[in-house]
Every structure is written in structure tokens, then in C-alpha cells.
Amino acid sequence: MQLLSPFTLGDLKLTNRLVMAPMTRNRALGNIPNRLMAEYYGQRATAGLIITEGTAPSPNGLGYARIPGIFSPEQREGWRLVTEAVHAQGGHIFVQLMHCGRVGSNLNLPAGAKLLAPSAVAMSGQIWTDSQGEQPYDKPRQMTGDDIAVAIAEFNSAARLAIEAGFDGIEIHGANGYLVNQFLDPGSNQRDDDFGGAGQSRNRFALEVAKAIIEAAGAARTGIRLSPYGVFNDMSGGYDNIAEQYIQLATELGRLGLAYLHLVDHSSMGAPKPEPATVTTMVEAFRTHGGGAAILSGGYDPVRAETDLQSGATDLVAFGRPFIANPDLVDRFRKGASLAVPDFATFYTPGPNGYTDYPPAQ
């Protein structure tokens, strides 16, 4: 089974081709990683690669309640608990840097932090706050040129802290409607400067963030996650020239020599299915222009994963929710064992219930 075969990612020797996808779990009380989180990730260290939950590079990026950050010494030391737990089991782990941008509430931000976005366009719907329950999304402030420069520098600083904390690398969250994706999408980016307008200009923020992280961690330790055609968090799900824009972005990311391109298909959860030709061409453009591996994610089972690996469509396959209730997912796939079903009610609640209490298969 190719899914269970080793793979070399940059200079990392992965024991298999299963990636634990990034999943927000809201257990970081005070936005600081803790021993409970270390236990959770350590339990799942048999994955070839773990990508952490979205982690804010600055106070401005903390849109949700109880998500972790990596912008302080305390957070760095909290994450060190996690990386040591994973490495003790022989695993590898990347941190996912996620700036929420407009996806947030001022009630979830620490004092002095600001809700910022490419344009002053509010999200629809409501968001959970620990202090006042469900609340409407607040309208963000449009980022100035200085705000953009500061945000890029914050990604650089966060990447440096991540390496100090022992992470094997960094994934840029450019998917699912968060800040990098907000710059890519014309619905959330209505600017008419160098960071808005045509697709190439909307790509600029993502590329500048990638360069900043490469400067801190090296290209071989930097990946990016994208979700073309995604609709999560009010993204457009498709627009004129989207394929051209994303293929150009993949080309430029390849030229930077990134370790991997991680593409997400959310059609299993109701989003439009990405155009297969666009995904294939993005992967080809990334690889042929100097990029490393491809990771595909979204609704996979072992059979589909094996098909895409053997065809060369991808090098690695990311699994998300199956890892929640199956910390021993790799072993279950190896043995053909049935999978436990996760409890959705505990996906985002604090504490160990539905987090570290799922047993391995007997």
C-alpha cells in the first residue's frame, strides 16, 4: 500500500504518506498551548506528518476563542511541549500559521488588537465568543499599507519562534477564508492598489508572506494550503479567471522552492468541487517550476488515497476528522480495522472530553 510507504519531504524522512490535516480544536486556554494539547498531538504522532491547528502569528490574528498563537515566549514554550511529545514518538510536525483577518469578533481579541482585513467587508452570520455567546461578526478595518507590512513581518517573527519551539516546518494557511485567502478572493478584497484588483495583484500578499517565512525558516521547511473554489467563511467559490489566478500563484510558489503545495477540496461538505483540470495544472505548475511535494485533502478514504498516489496526482494525502476519534489511524488503515466516529459536540469545547479520550483499536 503506497499510502503506508515512506516519503522524503525536503530533508524530512516521513514514515508514511498520511498527513494529519490542520483542525481547529479550541483547547488553548489564554491562547497558550498546554500539556493537554501535547498529549493530543503525541497520540497521533504515527502520522507521516502532523500539521497543527491554525495558530495566530499576532494578537490581531486571534479571531476565534481559545485558539493558540505563536507570538510570545510563553506560547513558544507551550508549543515546545507539543513538538517534544511528537518527536518523542518519532513523528514530524509543522505549525500552521493562520491569521483570521475579518473572521472574528472584537470580543475574542486581546486588549489593543484590531480586526483587520483587505477591505472593510464584514462576514455574514455569527461567531462564538466565550464572554457573550454567539455574536454577529464585527466589521473589520481595511488594512493600510503599513498594516500589511506589519502583518507580513509578524508572519516572519512567528516562523522564527516556531523553529525555536522545535517545529519541523511551517504551513501558511491560505485557504478557508482567512486573511491570506481574503486577499486572494475578489469578494473580500476590493482594493485598487498593489494588493488588489487583478488576480496577480491579489496574489501578492500570499507571495510576500511566503517570502517572509522562507527568510525565517527556509523554503524546504515552508508549505502552503490553498482552497480554490472554496466557499467557507464567505469565499466566492468561483469567479472569472480563478483558474488562471491560482495556476499563476502555484507557479510563483514553485519558483520560491516551497516544500509542498496543499490543496483542499471541500465538496464533501457542500462546497463546489474544484475543477479537476485546475487542480492538476496547479500541481504540475508547482512541481515543474521548482516546488516540492503535493498534498491533497478532502473527503479521502484509503481506496481513493491509494488511487491518487499511484496515479501521481499527489505525493501525500491529508486526513482530518478521521484522526479526531482514531489517534491510531495509521495502524487502523494498515490492519483494515473499522474507524471510530467522532463526537461533533466536543469538537470545539475546552477540556479532554472528545479530545484525548478516544482509545486505540483493540
Where are these regions (language model features)?
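Flavin-dependent oxidoreductase catalytic cores
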Residues: 1-362
